[in-house]
Amino acid sequence: MDEGIEKNIFVNLESQIDGVCPKFYVNVDDIDIIHEPPEFYQRLKKLIKKAQKRIFLSTLYIGKEERELINCLSNALSNNPSLHVHILADQLRCTRESPGCCSASLLMQLKKKFPDRCEIKLYHTPNLRGLRKQLVPHRFNEGWGLQHMKIYGADDNLIISGANLSRDYFTNRKDRYYLFSDKGLADFFFKTHFLFSQLSFECIPHLSDSSIQLSSTSPVIPFTLKWNNSCPNPLTNPQEFRVAASAKIQQLLQGNREKFLSRNPSKPLSSVYGSELINQAGDDNNKPFHKYEESAIVYPLFQCVPILTSDVHSTEEKVLSIIGTLLSRKEVNWTLTAGYFNVYPALRKQLLKSEGIGEVIVASQQANGFYRSPGPSKLIPPAYQYIAEQFLKDSRKKKRNIDVLQWQNKGNTYHAKGFWLSTQHHKHPFLTTIGSSNYTSRSQQLDLESTLVVMTQNEKLKRKFSTEIELIKQHTKPMNTCQLEKVPMYVKALTSLMKKKL
């Protein structure tokens, strides 16, 4: 009976998400969960070193001092003449320190050495341009939107994460990392990378005789940004840019769902993009077979509101709404974590309507990357603590069985985000989400985000989901038992005013 409840929930959820976004089937043995920052870095470098055809990295930024990573990419290109490297990052974040040393200037070392086999693309939000861009300080311009996806591919391997490519994310900034060894999924995300690259500026080196120098004493800016795409420039023609971008993205978001829904029902493992499980035993002439117990279903979700017209909708919010509806069932338990916990209103409402057991894992002030930082950013940790306190207070008012746990591990910061769902009589989750989104109003409306829903009935993978949660919870305490730093009244007021930017 209990098995039937979970299977019924699983199948119904699958049928609902099928109509929204692309779908892949991945063998559970081809999914590996990485737990710690140093392991993430070592695995990433290993994938880069072994790559034969392609490396594609979509990230917010590469740390301006990450010479080891750049050298790793350079060595891979030197050792394999057929290898190409494609990097997509955010322009505002990668040029913030310019004309000083910045992420973009570091990347130019690679571009200069391999001009024909290294592509650097920097996305710029259409929301910040003209006089406003000139007036907003560099430290704050990210508040108008970013390229926030974290997709790291090498040949047919893919790491989906929330981590950026900088020193703290390689050492002591806790995040989540899923490694997939699946050609269909890797091909899809390479196409995704290419699509968003077509909506971004190319970053190329300046010739030495035409470098930009602001004054006789200022450093030379070693790069220039060129718009050489077929669609309009987002900084000069934002509306036309959105129309063109929407046309390109719509097929990606929907994943040819008409073709998918009309597929041969006798071969349910054949996805739109060709990712499938094969019967290696050869008993059925290598035809795809359908066994929930041996596979995981993977749905790629995207959030890209700032570059879409009003008639085209992102898939992340739709699918999270479907998942959120499940929380009203008493059989469903859930865990949600976000280093920056400030879920958008519709999701917050669904969480507070949940009938099962719920957990929210948040960063303590000390585990927030902005703790005791200079300037106004030092107010960010108490602001997020206040938001978490308010959520806990509201859940108590509604008599919901929800705990808020604070994560703290001395010398480390916390950046993990994602959902896990399980049923009452099953310890191990059957679903998780993994990716870049913090599920905030800001990420929903301003940033480019990529998330995966991973569902399975395989006990081995479900136990891996459980292990991941347990390792995170090793460093947590219930918020109502912690000695919390007092949040000043002015921070509470500012948080209420600026909530959509957090």
Curated annotation (Swiss-Prot):
Query: What Gene3D superfamilies does the entry give?
Result: Endonuclease Chain A
Active site residues per record: 148, 150, 155
**Keywords carried by this UniProt record:** ATP-binding, Lipid biosynthesis, Lipid metabolism, Mitochondrion, Nucleotide-binding, Phospholipid biosynthesis, Phospholipid metabolism, Phosphoprotein, Repeat, Transferase
According to its UniProt record, this protein's enzyme class is: transferase
Q: In which pathway does this enzyme or protein participate?
A: Phospholipid metabolism; phosphatidylglycerol biosynthesis; phosphatidylglycerol from CDP-diacylglycerol: step 1/2
Q: Which family does it belong to?
A: Belongs to the CDP-alcohol phosphatidyltransferase class-II family.
Q: What is this protein called?
A: CDP-diacylglycerol--glycerol-3-phosphate 3-phosphatidyltransferase
Name of the encoding gene: pgs1
